[in-house]
Swiss-Prot record:
Keywords: Antibiotic resistance, ATP-binding, Cell inner membrane, Cell membrane, Membrane, Nucleotide-binding, Translocase, Transmembrane, Transmembrane helix, Transport. The chain crosses the membrane at residues 278-298, 527-547, 584-604, 619-639. It is found in: Cell inner membrane. This is Macrolide export ATP-binding/permease protein MacB. One of its GO terms (cellular component) is plasma membrane. The keyword Cytoplasm does not apply.
Amino acid sequence: MAGSTIELRGLRREFPSGEATVVALQDLDLTIEPGEMVAIMGASGSGKSTLMNILGCLDRPTSGSYRIAGRETSSLEADELSALRREHFGFIFQRYHLLPALSALGNVEIPAIYAGQPGEARRARAGELLARLGLADRSGHRPNQLSGGQQQRVSIARALMNGADVILADEPTGALDQRSGTEVLQILDELNRDGKTVIIVTHDASVAARAKRVIELRDGVVVADRLTSPEAARRAGDAPTRQPPATPRWNWRREYDRISEATRIAVLAMAAHRLRSFLTMLGIIIGIASVVFVVAVGDAAKRKVLADISSLGTNTIEIFPGKDMGDVRSSKIKTLVAADARALAQQPYIDGVTPTVSTTSTLRYGGLEANALVNGVGDQYFDVKGTKLASGRFFDASGLRDIVQDVVIDEKTRQTFFADVAGGAVGKVILIGKVPCRIVGVMQQQQSGFGSNQNLSVYLPYTTVQARFLGNSSLRSILLKVSDTVATADAEQDVTRFLTLRHRVKDFVILNTDDIRKTITSTTGTLTLMIAAIAVISLVVGGIGVMNIMLVSVSERVGEIGVRMAVGARRSDILQQFLIEAVVVCLIGGGLGVGVAFGLAALFNLVVPMFPLSLSGTSIAAAFVCSTGIGIVFGYLPARQASFLDPLAALSRD
């Protein structure tokens, strides 16, 4: 079976024109053997261009049969026709149809990209073809830097890139001067001598005279089919035959090359419309920056809240007199006493216990005085609260027993009374009300939060405060540290049962810091989610902007799509091309959005140093995942529209 024989039998092509039908080709019977050089002539409207489009698998006949290498084309799917165009045919167009964003070398490479040739081999062959056609020194030039003749030679090199054995030339000299036209025809002669089947569509008799066989059309009918040289009859069929290739199997390297090329084209397309690309990205930039920044603020707020809660102590519960929080009669309930604390200390689920009492008084030292909160606490208070000392020591159990007048002061008190005192505060005697107390320790500074306030605070043994300041034995509260092996909720239930039995009535209320932590963490998370959801709206708006611009890009690049399909791009290749472009736009926008979020976080940290923000790797990774997802979701419709364009219609609109 002749691998390259072209056979037309009863071929007919009709086009609708309003309510009428225009017949472009009528019942053509035609055979073109391998190695022939054929000119198809005819006046405008004779059907010669329609015939060439059908021969090149850019169009389908209305009826009849078109067989290439014995294979009926009417039954082939779109991708199978793409494979024929990619490997079997080479197109030379009157208007060149070179992609303006690519160099001469890049234009020649295009068919090989879709054929899956490796990058190095592809570039080497493209360079060889350009050198063969006298364009070695112009391989890096773009089409607008080349003359018409040079552009047509680039088009010829592109047609030869995949080793096509049928060259279809549509008015190859129509846009050239005489000299350039002659050079192009000489190249076609050489290709024919090399065994290529060359089919030239022309209305110029002098061009047709270069062919060995001339087919003349009139009103869609062959009116003449003659040989111009006896040699042509002998040479026809002598060319090596070749079976049309099957669609290549999937190969990861070929796919990588295609994706790399699509990414490069995407960047070039963006560079060609910088302002439009930036405005397209703006919605993505704002959306990603908002989401990442809001998540960072939410995380920082959560950390701050948890740190403030920790100032109440870790895994702690606190017992207050009263039937519930806010009980107005709680001050009259005197049943919460130190004996309760000692009894609770014996329970296995408790790691530490401290009674607490409090009052206010005036501090005096060296002519200075200030009001302060006087806290009476147990010797385990500082461990339960996780408090650390800047200097000195805490008082111990013997101090409670002996009702010592030792005091631990906070950092605010030190700054107020002892900032300029030589030797510091430890060891000095400060007057609290009328009671002289020796300073034994200074606490580290604590951030303001749940466990602190702006008042000065001092800490004495609770027995001392009861005896010297209050004159009674009741407690303000009992603070418990729950064992790490016990859930605070379980401990709370056990303490409730224990004290209820001990008091014979529930005259106390328990504050569980773990409940506070959970509530505030949940609230913070909800607020963060709500604000992030608002920020996501801008992402959706940005995605719609990407879709709109991609639709505009498709409409502007219809000609490019037609060229890519003509040289063998499958629908999936076109879909992939525009999807990748949408994803690249969104990824760059996402990267810029993350950069903006970093800038906002840095500015925020300068303005509010007590509330530091840090961007998490998770939120950044999520930002890029969102960017990719937006590109795919909102880029799919334009990409699909591009992939379903008819190659002939796309070329005609260029």
